[in-house]
Swiss-Prot record:
Natural source organism: Debaryomyces hansenii (strain ATCC 36239 / CBS 767 / BCRC 21394 / JCM 1990 / NBRC 0083 / IGC 2968) (Yeast)
InterPro entries associated with the record: GINS_A, GINS_bundle-like_dom_sf, GINS_Psf3, GINS_Psf3_sf, PSF3_N
Pfam families: PSF3_N, Sld5
Primary residence: nucleus
Stated name of the protein: DNA replication complex GINS protein PSF3
Keywords recorded for this protein, A-Z: DNA replication, Nucleus
Length: 176
C-alpha cells in the first residue's frame, strides 16, 4: 500500500511501532535497543516503526536467499483478544485507546499480508460504529455520550464531524 505524503494520519500510522525479530546479526544497530556502538543480535525482538519494518521485511539478504532482514510479528492491535472483542460488540470498543489511527494501520497491515479476514472484521466494525456515529451526529438536541465520542479513532472523528456538519447544513436549508 502506498502512503499519502500529505496525509498526517497516514504519516502517524507509518510511525506506529510494530514488533519484529531480526533474522541476522547487524553490526552498529545496537542503538535501536539502547546499546550504541553494539551489534543487534540475531533473534532480537524489537519494535520498529512500520515504515522501516515494512522495508526490512521485504528486502532479501541476497539474491540467492529468500530470507529477509526481519520477520514481522502480529501487533497487539489485531491480536485475537481485540478481534474477538470487535466481533462481539464493535460499538463498545475504545478504538482510541487501542490505536489512534486504527483503521489506517489495519488497512496497511491487511494490505501487506492480504489478510482478508482482518478486512472483513474491520469493515463490519466500521459499519456498526458508523451507524452509531450517525445517530450521535444527527441528534444534536440529545445529550452526547462522551464516552463513545472519546472512543473514536481519528478516521471516525472526521466522519463524526462531516456527518454533524452535513446535518446542520441540511437543517439550515430546510429552515430557509
Amino acid at each position: 500500500m502506498t502512503s499519502n505524503y500529505f496525509d498526517l494520519d497516514d504519516i502517524l500510522s507509518d510511525g506506529e511501532k510494530i514488533p519484529c525479530r531480526f533474522n541476522i546479526t547487524v553490526p552498529g544497530l545496537g542503538y535501536l535497543e539502547g546499546n550504541p556502538g553494539k551489534s543487534i543480535a540475531k533473534d532480537t525482538k524489537i519494535e520498529l516503526p512500520l515504515w522501516l519494518a515494512e522495508i526490512l521485511a521485504i528486502c532479501e539478504l541476497s539474491e540467492d536467499s529468500q530470507q529477509s532482514f526481519i520477520d514481522l510479528s502480529q501487533p497487539d492491535f489485531i491480536n485475537y483478544k481485540v478481534i474477538n472483542a470487535i466481533k462481539t460488540n464493535a460499538v463498545n470498543i475504545d478504538l482510541h485507546s487501542i490505536l489512534t489511527n486504527y483503521y489506517k494501520l489495519s488497512e496497511k497491515w491487511a494490505s501487506m499480508f492480504n489478510d482478508v479476514e482482518l478486512i472483513e472484521v474491520v469493515m463490519q466494525m466500521l459499519k456498526e460504529r458508523s451507524f452509531e456515529i450517525n445517530n450521535y451526529a444527527s441528534n444534536a438536541s440529545k445529550q452526547i455520550n462522551n464516552n463513545f465520542i472519546f472512543s473514536l479513532d481519528e478516521f471516525e472523528k472526521k466522519l463524526f464531524k462531516v456527518t454533524s456538519d452535513s446535518n446542520k447544513q441540511m437543517r439550515k436549508w430546510l429552515k430557509d
